[in-house]
Amino acid sequence: MTPTLKAAAFAVLVAGAGSVSAFAPLTIVDQGSLAAGGTVIQNDGTYDNDAPTAAGQTFHGDHLYAFYQVPENARPLPLVLWHGAYQSGRSWETTSDGREGFQTLFLRRGFPVYVIDQPRRGRAGNSTVAASVEPTPYDQLFFDQFRFGRWPDYFPGVQVDQTARTLDQFFRSVTPNTGPYDPRVLADGVSALVDRVGPAVLVTHSQAGGPGWLTAIENANVKGIVALEPGSGFVFPEGEMPEEMPSAAGTLTPEAIPAADFDKLTRIPIVIYYGDNIPTEPTTERGKDNWRVRLAMARLWVEAVNRHGGDATLVHLPEIGITGNTHFLMSDLNSVQIADLIARFLGEKHLD
């Protein structure tokens, strides 16, 4: 156990040039970081200390990185916060406009929190499979796809601070894969983490949705899943696959898994949240239509889980009167309200 840390009373949180905020004190009784999962490649030959080559050497890769904090009087189940595509653990830290992120909001609610960088991303960049990282311009595409608006205009009423400084901070949170995207590698990494941590709840965002289901299938220590706008990896029992869903952004294809594996998803409570500005009818607007099919597929997925005796819920926020949310529910201006919804779910399902 590390010495008690008094955090945030005098914390400096930089949202942009010259922006400083101080938050109420928060007592942290333990914190640290670790790697989990991964593999080791062993080269043939003998290592020569004085004439080193690749011969006989090893390479550690495909692990995840986790930073954890445990608050005073912690609840029993930690939350594992798992970022989406082109993101890292920073997604859950200070928001782009300088407010407390989910990392801190849930520490304040008494949950131990593990913030991860998944394998082949961020601080877990060692990939055992080669890939190239090119300086590809895609800021405007992300602005549209994450439903801030339709570049260069924001949607009316969108839950985003519209200053140039905040947008700059968001774009600088983008980070690439350092190896090929492989959901099994990601699931293995998070499974190794919960093996070490013990029973936990996954909080996934976007691309992490699919690997999140796989982790729950792989490891019974996953006691529940909160999925924020899952974007792919919708798994269905073999023989119960819905049709592919074409959109202006491409075709969304469901994935088949054995019925016995799918059944494991029926044993834990699951909730899925989607934000605003998602159409119900096809549109040529790529950024919106991309999420139309994902929301539709998620509805079918929830129906399938419940049809097999599970406990899955989908919440489309505008349907309960919460409007303006982007793809980044956890960092939108109403992120405290979203955190309250999640905390209520965790309480109702005895995951707190």
Features from the language model and the residues they span:
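Catalytic active-site module of serine/aspartate enzymes centered on a nucleophile-bearing elbow/loop
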Residues: G324, F328-D352
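N-terminal cap/lid segment of alpha/beta-hydrolase-fold proteins
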Residues: F23-A74
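The feature captures the conserved acid-bearing segment of alpha/beta-hydrolase catalytic domains
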Residues: S232-H308, T313
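Short beta-strand element of the alpha/beta-hydrolase
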Residues: P76-A85
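A conserved short beta-strand
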Residues: A220-V235
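Conserved alpha/beta-hydrolase
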Residues: R99-G125
